[in-house]
Amino acid sequence: MADYWKSQPKKFCDYCKCWIADNRPSVEFHERGKNHKENVAKRISEIKQKSLDKAKEEEKASKEFAAMEAAALKAYQEDLKRLGLESEILEPSITPVTSTIPPTSTSNQQKEKKEKKKRKKDPSKGRWVEGITSEGYHYYYDLISGASQWEKPEGFQGDLKKTAVKTVWVEGLSEDGFTYYYNTETGESRWEKPDDFIPHTSDLPSSKVNENSLGTLDESKSSDSHSDSDGEQEAEEGGVSTETEKPKIKFKEKNKNSDGGSDPETQKEKSIQKQNSLGSNEEKSKTLKKSNPYGEWQEIKQEVESHEEVDLELPSTENEYVSTSEADGGGEPKVVFKEKTVTSLGVMADGVAPVFKKRRTENGKSRNLRQRGDDQ
């Protein structure tokens, strides 16, 4: 059987971050050491400091939440005061509770029972609040449960002042310049002025201007029909001046009685008067017309283009360029190469042939040949 070595078990110390032998004498010797005891005390102090910091943070957060709740409750009570309602939620008050005073708890319970009975008797008093959506619909909100509904709750009594001043009908202006009336509760719209319509003080000047413009439009429409009588014209002209005092909407009405047997002279005078009134009414309607954010319609007039030749005073370019045929006619110039002969290779005596010197070799040996060494 083969022999083998077995290593001793080791143990890791978390405080000192080192390995020691996993036996009783080694562990006891390490724990009795000064370094190990200092590390243990240091770890305990760190844990204590962390727990204190965590407790401080929790206390700070609880104080912040309490301040937020108090501010929210204060704002809620201010809203209730602004709406003219009584707050049913009491402010939170911190009072020390002791076991030596048992009758106070019973008295508080009796008061709470009485309040609950009162609330059951008058469930809608001071509980429901009426609101209006952005589209003009009315809804009712429960302050206690937070529920909302469209139907009016039983026993609900809103502010009498608000309901008296509240206007159901709203005056508007159509795209054609006619005024109409819109009911915010039922969604109904009509051209005739309702009986219970209450105009706003800020809307009076605009309504007068709209009525003046409507009166001028009605006059222009009535002038197109030749069957209108003189009495109607005077009534319409007088209506333009009196409309500013009393708001009314006039629509086009046809006269049943036709003046077929009138004289031609009176008809001419009537036509002249109608043309004059039309011109003045058109000018008034232009000035009193409601401004359109996209601009007004304009008639496009086509301009006749004249094809007359216009002298642009450009520089003349008659002799500036040469035609391509003239440029190609000359052709490319021919290149002539000259020949040169060498008469002599340099300064030398007459009658002596040129001598070419050979390259000297080192000790009579050629460099290109591989020479055998001296050892061989």
Swiss-Prot record:
Residues 357-375 are annotated as: Interaction with SNRNP200. CDD domains: WW. Residues 203-215, 316-326 have a biased composition (Polar residues). It comes from the Eukaryota. It is found in: Nucleus; Nucleus speckle. Keywords: Disease variant, Intellectual disability, Metal-binding, mRNA processing, mRNA splicing, Nucleus, Phosphoprotein, Repeat, Spliceosome, Zinc, Zinc-finger. The modification Phosphoserine is found at S220, S227, S229, S262. Residues 94-128, 189-335, 356-376 are annotated as: Disordered. InterPro entries: Matrin/U1-C_Znf_C2H2 (IPR000690), Matrin/U1-like-C_Znf_C2H2 (IPR003604), U1-CZ_Znf_C2H2 (IPR013085), WBP4 (IPR040023), WW_dom (IPR001202), WW_dom_sf (IPR036020), Znf_C2H2_sf (IPR036236). One of its GO terms (molecular function) is zinc ion binding. PANTHER family: WW DOMAIN BINDING PROTEIN 4, WW DOMAIN-BINDING PROTEIN 4. Component of the spliceosome B complex. Associated with U2 snRNPs. Binds splicing factors SNRPB, SNRPC and SF1. Interacts via the WW domains with the Pro-rich domains of KHDRBS1/SAM68. Interacts via the WW domains with the Pro-rich domains of WBP11. Interacts with SNRNP200. This is WW domain-binding protein 4.
